[in-house]
């Protein structure tokens, strides 16, 4: 079962939750990065939050280059989850705690995602662990949310370790169990690692990647 209907619904609920509770659009700090998601004026030189909303991509994002580089077939849900929309990260509440679902802000962000996904999968191979790919963070970034690439199930994963706690048998069911979390926009800190400087998707991976690199 594709996760796309569940993702569509969550995005609709997410947008509506902010309109209903705050009477305004979603807000996000793009840190100088343009995006079709931005509503209203955008000035790259101004350090301020912008109004935004998710935008369906005209051309679906593809991970064929990642599969080719790693000689690995990825679970097809990766295309539905990351390749359908441009969006800021999505905050959520759940029975497992608070967290965020990662999304891509623009094409540069998508390229950054692919590069870091390759790095993650190469690390899994180096550690002789089954391949996984990340979809988000739990508990303020202390834990990764990952997909088991062999069957599409959702797990909690600590950097450098094999996932031990399954949350859902599918990404569709997992997304369906989440509730939008309303919170003010937070400006992400600059990261010292060049590969992670892009402010869209990987600012949220600060602790995760520091821990991961520390285990090499």
UniProtKB/Swiss-Prot annotation:
<protein>
    <recommendedName>
        <fullName>Protein Syd</fullName>
    </recommendedName>
</protein>
<dbReference type="InterPro" id="IPR038228">
    <property type="entry name" value="Syd_sf"/>
</dbReference>
<keyword id="KW-0472">Membrane</keyword>
<keyword id="KW-0997">Cell inner membrane</keyword>
<keyword id="KW-1003">Cell membrane</keyword>
<comment type="similarity">
    <text>Belongs to the Syd family.</text>
</comment>
<dbReference type="InterPro" id="IPR009948">
    <property type="entry name" value="Syd"/>
</dbReference>
<comment type="function">
    <text>Interacts with the SecY protein in vivo. May bind preferentially to an uncomplexed state of SecY, thus functioning either as a chelating agent for excess SecY in the cell or as a regulatory factor that negatively controls the translocase function.</text>
</comment>
<dbReference type="GO" id="GO:0009898">
    <property type="term" value="C:cytoplasmic side of plasma membrane"/>
</dbReference>
<dbReference type="Pfam" id="PF07348">
    <property type="entry name" value="Syd"/>
</dbReference>
